[in-house]
């Protein structure tokens, strides 16, 4: 997290300190408008010892807790700016639009859903209040029947009213009836007609702008936005053109580079090495990928319809408010005032209106229109950041001096009012800015109108909207439809034509300025006749005047110096293992990841809101192509880095020995950059080099002479976007804004200021020591700890924020920009933390629901198991009861010994049978031997008696065998088994003796013979 930076020199007189790292020090920009100057005051002596890099935020916040929050501009600064680290985040905070079109759509859908819920809750609350009033009236008049009837009637009326209001609210959400078929067909034909017109206009504009790029000309900020707008329209109108345009650009890039060398970044080198050409080609492809990624952010969502009802309502409101006789309600003013975007309003205002805004904010009113827009844009960003900080802390926490500074910074009356009045108007500003989301541009414009301070705020806004140009209404109407996915091609044509007109005006203004400079150079005042003795005496005075005039006119940093610094940085990039290209690819990957998150959030919100909005097909195709292109560029970069490593290893014999000691962080010294600039350009203006040096020093947070390549590149891009001429005063403000970003990460790519300056000198091959010193002084302002090392991200951030337009910022403006970027960095970090917390809470709730569901399933399973066990127990109890009632006959059986020989038992039984067969007299019922008779005698004389005796003998033998079998069964069967016994194999019959076998055979023969008889 960011820590505060301590500045050297005169800024040490400042005593402005923060009580909290996250909150207090963010409001420092409120005192930026004070006109007090303390440049003649000496430096402060009682500096606190510098802390180490590992100083924690908690310790720093505790040490800052007892100081005051705000001081006038005479005391503006930080005592702790020398320690802490700076990390200038390379995210969308530098851009004019903070997010993609999809993110804007998501925010709008959320706001609409929130407004609907608030309306329903308000109507329900009104219905409940009416019911309460009716019930109280019924209670008061309950003594009489007439009063009771009246109360019942009132209650029914209130219930009917609440039901009607809810029905109306429900009817609002019901889809409107479809138009007739003929009307719909005509609307579609008109839509496609304007779509074809827009297609041809886009092709013509893209061709012109691309031709300027191929010829080596730099596009201004407005031209760059126009190119992105027209390219996104081409992809939207013809989605499959992504498969044609993007591969066509990739394949023809080598051809373009060959026939149009002006599109290559100029490094003032004549080397024809293949590696150098490959690196330059990689830089161009990276620029193309960056442009396509920015175009992807500009592509809106897609809707089934083409006409927006809200856009039509806004058009009717804008037409009605411009007519003084038409009445406009306050609700309509607040509702549609939030639709005027700051960027749209600033781009559409005339020079007179811009100058009036600058006077209100006490800014410079001299300069081009582009310069006025730039400093107003910078100031509005600062005010928006301060509004969020003050709202978080509360207006009541500010003292009188802080209230005066905050009101003065917002163009409100600050002196001659009571403290309560100051708090009231500041609360009103913050409420309109944050809660009602009224743009600060309209609030500031309302201060420029000749309206009494006692007037109502809505009346001020009404008069302000009334004087806005027509272009503001067209842009806002298109933005409303675009956020809903309902793009009107006719309105888009009007906007593009208006932008083309403004581009021509800016080119004409730039051309006139160039002609004026050339005419001023050609005009020469005739020198008067001077004697030799006077000439020799005044030579020293003339040299001194020339030196002072050069230093006064060229104190600021111009776009030429920015290009010089950028070229020196790219030259150092090849020696620093292509850190610039690596950082660019890293940024592109982060941007694509953010875009993917926006798309996922759109899907979630769409399911809740039930709106038929989705990501367009062209955006999907373009996302896939850009993602594939970045992957290819990453592989090319790795290949190029490996080749450079091999070349260095082959050229240097001690490379292998020294490579292990190289720091993982790529360091670039300020002196190296200055030397590079000297090699690049041989000039006689040493002051110009001093400007770049000052810029690099300001980027050096820890003042070690080493800065990150990423920070330098971002600063170059920020200034180059506006193509600005920055004077010394604005440069100080700009650098102050960047130097306040105290948390610089040591794992970033950093660059030594000395190395950067050496490369600048070599590339320019210049002897302009004064200019080099000025550049070096600027670089030193980025060096917080004065160690000669700054981060490239600091420089890139500054230069990207300034942009492409031809303006010139002072040192003060650069310091203010550094401060602004620091505030945006902290607020963005807090927003990311809040978003991460919300996401983690959502995931925790989802996980909790899953755990609860699993617990419910587990508890259900346990209950089922308990029920099953209970049923089993009941069945067992029933079986036990049945066993007790039925007699157990198995217990009567004798238990067979477990290891008793069954064969022996069978043998004993066989012996019993043998004895029974041999001794029939043992049976008392058996017949005697005398009555039997012999065979022949029986056959002749006693036939019937002998036959009956044979039958009796057979029945006796059968009964004996049955009894023996029953006894054997009782011995074999178990006596304790209740259920069905298992299948028991029949044991093999043991071998019997020959005597038993013969007896059995004789017995069977006798029985058979008797049966036959």
Swiss-Prot record:
The keyword Magnesium does not apply. InterPro entries: EF-hand-dom_pair, EF_Hand_1_Ca_BS, EF_hand_dom, LETM1-like_RBD, LETM1/MDM38-like. It comes from the Eukaryota. The gene is Letm1. Mitochondrial proton/calcium antiporter that mediates proton-dependent calcium efflux from mitochondrion. This is Mitochondrial proton/calcium exchanger protein. Pfam families: EF-hand_5, LETM1_RBD. It comes from Drosophila melanogaster (Fruit fly). It is a single-pass membrane protein.
């Amino acid at each position: 997290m960011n820590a505060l930076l301590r500045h050297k020199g005169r800024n040490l007189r400042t005593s402005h300190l923060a009580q909290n790292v996250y909150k207090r020090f963010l409001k420092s920009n409120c005192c930026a408008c004070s006109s007090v100057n303390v440049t003649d005051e000496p430096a402060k002596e009682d500096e606190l010892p510098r802390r180490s890099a590992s100083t924690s935020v908690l310790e720093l916040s505790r040490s800052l807790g007892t100081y005051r929050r705000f001081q006038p501009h005479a005391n503006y600064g930080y005592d702790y700016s020398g320690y802490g680290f700076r990390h200038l985040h390379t995210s969308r905070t530098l851009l004019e639009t903070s997010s993609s079109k999809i993110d804007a759509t998501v925010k709008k859908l959320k706001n609409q859903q929130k407004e609907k819920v608030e309306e329903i809750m308000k109507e329900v609350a009104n219905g409940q209040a009416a019911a309460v009033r009716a019930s109280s009236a019924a209670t008061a008049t309950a003594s009489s029947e007439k009063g009771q009837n009246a109360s019942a009637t009132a209650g029914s009326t209130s219930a009917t009213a609440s039901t009607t209001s809810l029905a109306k609210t429900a009817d609002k959400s019901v889809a409107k009836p479809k138009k007739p078929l003929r009307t719909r067909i005509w609307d579609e034909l008109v839509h496609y007609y304007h779509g074809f017109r827009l297609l041809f206009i886009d092709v013509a504009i893209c061709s012109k702008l691309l031709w300027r790029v191929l010829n080596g000309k730099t596009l201004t900020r407005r031209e760059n936005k126009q190119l992105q707008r027209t390219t996104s329209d081409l992809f939207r109108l013809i989605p499959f053109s992504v498969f044609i345009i993007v591969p066509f650009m990739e394949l023809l890039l080598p051809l373009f580079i060959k026939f149009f060398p002006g599109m290559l970044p100029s490094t003032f080198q004549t080397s024809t090495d293949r590696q150098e050409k490959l690196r330059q080609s990689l830089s161009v492809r990276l620029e193309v990928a960056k442009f396509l990624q920015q175009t992807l952010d500009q592509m809106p969502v897609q809707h089934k319809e083409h006409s927006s009802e809200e856009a039509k309502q806004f058009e009717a409101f804008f037409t009605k408010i411009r007519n003084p006789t038409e009445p406009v309600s306050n609700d309509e003013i607040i509702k549609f005032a939030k639709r005027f975007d700051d960027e749209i309003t600033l781009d559409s205002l005339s020079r007179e209106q811009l100058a009036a805004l600058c006077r209100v904010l006490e800014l410079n009113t001299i300069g081009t229109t582009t310069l006025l827009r730039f400093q107003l844009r910078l100031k509005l960003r600062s005010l928006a950041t301060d509004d969020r900080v003050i709202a978080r802390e509360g207006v009541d926490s500010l003292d009188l001096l802080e209230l005066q500074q905050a009101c003065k910074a917002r163009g409100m009356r600050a002196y001659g009012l009571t403290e309560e009045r100051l708090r009231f108007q500041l609360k009103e500003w913050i409420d309109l800015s944050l809660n009602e989301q009224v743009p600060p541009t309209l609030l500031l414009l309302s201060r420029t109108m000749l309206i009494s301070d006692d007037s109502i705020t809505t009346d001020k806004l009404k008069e302000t909207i009334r004087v806005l140009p027509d272009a503001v209404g067209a842009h806002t109407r298109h933005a409303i439809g675009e956020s809903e996915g309902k793009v009107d091609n006719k309105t888009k044509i009007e906007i593009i034509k208006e932008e083309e007109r403004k581009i021509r005006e800016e080119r004409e203004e730039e051309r006139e300025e160039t002609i004026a400079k050339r005419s001023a150079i050609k005009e020469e005042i005739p020198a008067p006749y001077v004697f030799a003795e006077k000439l020799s005496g005044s030579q020293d005075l003339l040299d001194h005047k020339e030196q002072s005039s050069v230093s006064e006119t060229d104190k600021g940093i111009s776009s030429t110096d920015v290009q010089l610094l950028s070229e020196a940085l790219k030259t150092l990039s090849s020696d620093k293992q292509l850190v610039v290209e690596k950082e660019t690819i890293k940024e592109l990957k982060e941007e694509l990841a953010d875009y993917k998150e926006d798309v996922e959030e759109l899907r979630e919100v769409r399911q809740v809101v039930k709106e038929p909005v989705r990501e367009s097909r062209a955006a999907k195709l373009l996302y896939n192509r850009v993602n594939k292109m970045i992957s290819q560029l990453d592989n090319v970069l790795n290949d190029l880095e490996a080749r450079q490593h091999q070349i260095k290893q082959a050229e240097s014999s001690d490379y292998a020995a020294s490579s292990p000691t190289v720091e993982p962080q790529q360091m670039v010294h300020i002196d190296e950059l200055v030397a590079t600039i000297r090699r690049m350009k041989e000039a006689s203006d040493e002051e110009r080099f001093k400007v770049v040096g000052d810029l690099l020093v300001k980027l050096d947070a820890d003042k070690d002479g080493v800065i990150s390549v990423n920070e330098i590149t971002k600063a170059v891009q920020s200034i180059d976007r506006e193509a600005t001429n920055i004077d010394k005063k604005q440069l100080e403000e700009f650098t102050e804004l960047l130097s306040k970003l105290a948390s610089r990460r040591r794992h970033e790519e950093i660059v030594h200021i000395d190395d950067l300056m050496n490369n600048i000198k070599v590339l320019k091959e210049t002897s302009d020591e004064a200019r080099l010193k000025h550049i070096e002084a600027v670089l030193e302002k980025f060096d917080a700890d004065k160690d000669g090392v700054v981060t490239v991200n600091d420089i890139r951030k500054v230069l990207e924020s300034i942009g492409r337009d031809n303006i010139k910022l002072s040192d003060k403006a650069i310091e203010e920009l550094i401060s602004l970027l620091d505030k945006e960095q902290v607020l963005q970090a807090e927003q990311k933390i809040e978003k991460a917390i919300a996401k983690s809470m959502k995931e925790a709730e989802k996980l909790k629901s899953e755990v609860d569901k699993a617990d419910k399933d587990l508890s259900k399973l346990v209950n089922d198991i308990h029920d099953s066990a209970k049923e089993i127990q009941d069945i067992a109890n029933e079986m036990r009861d049945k066993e007790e009632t039925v007699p157990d006959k198995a217990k009567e059986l004798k238990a067979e010994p477990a290891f008793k020989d069954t064969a022996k038992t069978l043998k004993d039984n066989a012996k019993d049978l043998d004895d029974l067969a041999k001794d029939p007299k043992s049976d008392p019922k058996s017949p005697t031997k005398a009555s039997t008779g012999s065979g022949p005698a029986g056959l002749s004389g006693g036939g019937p008696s002998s036959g009956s005796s044979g039958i009796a003998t057979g029945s006796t033998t059968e009964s004996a065998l049955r009894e023996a079998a029953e006894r054997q069964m009782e011995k074999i069967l178990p006596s304790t088994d209740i259920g069905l016994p298992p299948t028991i194999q029949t044991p093999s019959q043991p071998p019997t003796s020959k005597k038993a076998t013969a007896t059995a055979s004789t017995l069977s023969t006798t029985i058979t013979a008797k049966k036959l008889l």
